[in-house]
Amino acid sequence: GAALPGIESALNRSLVAVSAEAVGALEVMLQKTVEYSKTRKQFGTAIGTFQALQHRMADMFIQCQLARSIVIMAAMSLDSDDSSVEKTKAVAAAKSRVGRAIKSVGQEAIQIHGGIAMTEELDVGHFFKRVTALDLAYGDGDYHTQRFAAL
């Protein structure tokens, strides 16, 4: 009964924290992917000069910025005068958006790095594993899309 608002508040704050951590990790993955594309050579030239890969990295950047923006909005809503339902909707939207960004940015980073991305020597694989775990924490993006729709 009376504890429910406190539990909802704690859950929403936890979801924002998990989402923010994921956004930070995604931005590192993007940065490392761009750096790698400048040094990895194929056909005698850096793969970062290939327009198709530039487009993919631009899409990764867009996904990171979308996720960052909505997480900031959700964090701001937690300290606002919005109703509990509005706060929960903002948080669910953020977790949903971050879940989609995790899939998009994570998979692109792994593909651009190639097989080396999943070795223990390269930290992109570690980041990918971490963001995958963060996506599943407190319900994945699909769950929060349904949660948002139900509110």
Feature-to-residue mapping (PLM):
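Alpha-helical interface subdomain recognition
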Residues: 9-151
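Long, acidic (Asp/Glu-rich), low-complexity accessory segments flanking structured domains
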Residues: 1-5
